[in-house]
């Protein structure tokens, strides 16, 4: 059986092709899953997300955690920022060549919704400042919400992406997402309490 590559660190570098990212902004927090992780997000001209663990963990677990953080940051920015590179390091079990091959695999396997459509790139630099909002508690709530949203969130991201879908398809997706989103909002807040799903014919 092929050995799963493991390491202790993932660093992702983002650069905006059209403007310098403002800063300095920085936030750090720790989360406990099966293993403990420390996350740092720094921004000044570029953005850097660093995820570290005290022990070797699967590179796929590191990348999955990174992807969830990236999607959370997208809510604050209003669009995805271009990912320039992923760096995997600090492994006690595999050499750098294997880690480099994993880096290439992750970069080539990026889904198309990580490239936001032009209409998402507003002239303002961001919608919300991540450094004043993100905490370990907020991230844990985000993980739970992602599980609850499931395919709804992915459809939303594809509707805002530069994926080649026509505008009418994107609009149809967004309209279809209204009902499940309202149900989730009703479940967690007092908003839209009077709305009920209509009969489908």
Protein language model regions, located:
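Amphipathic alpha-helical interface elements
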Residues: 145-201
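Charged, non-catalytic interaction/linker regions at domain boundaries
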Residues: 1-153, 161-165
């Amino acid at each position: 059986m092929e050995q799963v590559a493991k390491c202790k660190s993932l660093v992702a570098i983002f650069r905006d092709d059209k403007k310098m990212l403002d800063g300095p902004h920085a936030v750090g927090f720790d989360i406990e899953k099966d293993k403990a992780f420390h996350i740092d997000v720094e921004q000044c001209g570029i953005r850097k997300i660093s995820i570290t663990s005290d022990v070797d963990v699967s590179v796929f677990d590191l990348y999955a955690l990174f992807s969830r953080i990236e999607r959370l940051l997208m809510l604050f920015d209003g669009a995805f920022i271009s990912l320039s590179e992923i760096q995997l390091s600090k492994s006690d079990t595999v050499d750098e060549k294997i880690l480099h091959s994993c880096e290439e695999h992750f970069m080539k396997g990026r889904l198309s919704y990580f490239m936001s459509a032009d209409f998402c790139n507003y002239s303002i630099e961001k919608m919300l400042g991540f450094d004043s909002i993100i905490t370990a508690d907020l991230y844990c709530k985000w993980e739970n919400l992602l599980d609850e949203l499931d395919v709804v969130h992915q459809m939303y991201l594809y509707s805002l992406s530069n994926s080649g879908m026509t505008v009418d398809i994107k609009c149809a997706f967004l309209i279809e997402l209204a009902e499940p989103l309202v149900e989730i909002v009703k479940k967690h807040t007092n908003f839209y309490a009077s709305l009920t799903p209509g009969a489908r014919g």
